[in-house]
Every structure is written in C-alpha cells, then in structure tokens.
From Swiss-Prot:
Protein name: Protein-L-isoaspartate O-methyltransferase
Keywords assigned by UniProt, alphabetized: Cytoplasm, Methyltransferase, S-adenosyl-L-methionine, Transferase
Catalytic machinery residues: 74
InterPro entries: PCMT, SAM-dependent_MTases_sf
Intracellular or extracellular location(s): Cytoplasm
Protein's gene: pcm
NCBIfam families to which the protein is assigned, alphabetical: pimt, PRK00312.1
Functional note: Catalyzes the methyl esterification of L-isoaspartyl residues in peptides and proteins that result from spontaneous decomposition of normal L-aspartyl and L-asparaginyl residues. It plays a role in the repair and/or degradation of damaged proteins.
Source organism of this protein record: Methylorubrum extorquens (strain PA1) (Methylobacterium extorquens)
C-alpha cells in the first residue's frame, strides 16, 4: 500500500483549518473583534507554521507561546486587537517592529497591505523570512534596531510595535504619515498599556488607551546570533 505524504509546514491541514475557524469565533469575535479583513486573514494564516514543531498542537490555544531567544508569539486575540487598532486599508504601508516569528507580518500581508518588518534577532528574522516565503507572502524584512524604524521606507500609514517600550521612540513617531497610526505597548513589566497614537499634525498626536497588556521589552541594538 502506498504511503501517505504528510503535509509540509506551509500547507494547512483540514483539522487545523477547523481549529483556526474555532479560534476566530471563540477568541476573537467573542471578544469584540469586528474588522472582517483581520478575521479573514487570521482564518487563513496557519499559525502552526510560526511556532516550534513541538508546540504545533498548541498553536490555536488562547495564549502566547515561546519561539526562542526569550521571545514569544503573542496570544491570537492580542494580535487581532493590535492590527484592528491600526484601521488599515488595502495598499497601506505598514511597519512592524519586532517581527519575531513573522506571524503578525503574515496576517498583515494577507490583508493586502505593504509590509515592512524589523527583527533584532538574526536567527528569528531569517526563520521568519523563510516561513513567509514558503507561504507565498510578500514582506520586506530586515535585521536591525527597531527603535530607529526604517527611514528609507518611510513614511508609513501605520506602525505596529510588537514589544513594550518604556517610552514611545521618537523616530517611529517621525516616520508616520499625516493621520498615520502607531500601536505600541508602553510601560514597565506588570504595568504595560496598549496605546494608539494618531498623527494630527507635525508634533501633535491623539492617544487612545486599549487597556493593559504584557509584552517582552523593546530592546535597543541587534541581538546576538543565538540559535532559536
């Protein structure tokens, strides 16, 4: 009897497609996520492709998971909340700071926006680039210090920061277009708040608080080439 070929990491399997649908309905819609583009993208992107093989069975759980070098893939609801807060339209130019395993960048790319992503850990960044390419998603990703943003690609319609800053980096604020949105967790461990800044003028920003969150810190510089 011929053997059955196992699906690759880049090919969603039926039971995991069902798990994605359950995740969207029970974790996102039930908590108030309404942006259809966000929901559709998170139904489509295989989260199991962005976690270590040993944790693939937990990919659709309601919480973060470790991805190596002290970093995590965020809880699905938090990813959805942050991306919904960006209020994106197709074709928008979006910068993600702290790309990690590449999952949020994949969701953004699936939504039809132009994605630029920065990751300070080379091992994570290179692995994320490979995953995104395997899924046929177009993301410009580089290894670097997220505090500096990506001046050569600026200005951006939206910036997503997937790590908590003690303050909001001025370089990121400067790289927003007029009416551009910056979503970032701010504060010390145990006291972080998710904020959205909307640029209303050269040096004028409107702020909205989305409540308490918990993220790894936004660090300066480029990380060591530790194995993932």
């Amino acid at each position: 009897m011929p053997g059955r070929t196992a699906p690759t990491r880049s090919e969603p399997v039926p039971d995991r497609a069902e798990a994605r649908t359950r995740m969207v309905e029970t974790q996102l819609v039930a908590r108030g996520i309404r942006d259809a583009a966000v929901l559709d993208a998170m139904r489509a992107v295989p989260r199991e492709a962005f976690v270590p093989d040993a944790l693939a069975g937990e990919a659709y759980g309601d919480g973060p998971l470790p991805i190596g070098v002290g970093q995590t893939i965020s809880q699905p609801y938090i990813v959805a909340l942050m991306i919904e807060a960006l209020a994106l339209r197709p074709g928008d130019r979006v910068l993600e700071v702290g790309a990690g395993c590449g999952y949020a960048a994949a969701v953004l790319a699936r939504m039809g926006v132009q994605v630029f992503a920065i990751e300070r850990h080379a091992a994570l960044g290179e692995a994320a680039r490979a995953r995104l390419a395997a899924l046929g998603l177009t993301v410009s990703l580089r290894i670097g210090d997220g505090h500096a943003g990506w001046p050569e690609a600026a200005p951006f319609d939206a910036i997503l920061v997937s790590a908590a800053g003690s303050t909001i980096p001025e370089a990121l604020k400067a790289q927003l277009k007029p009416r551009g949105r910056l979503v970032i967790p701010v504060g010390p461990p145990g006291g972080q708040t998710l904020l959205r800044l909307t640029r209303r003028g050269r040096d004028r920003f409107e702020s909205r608080d989305f409540g308490p969150v918990s993220f790894v810190p936004l660090l300066r510089g480029v990380g060591t080439a530790d194995p993932v």
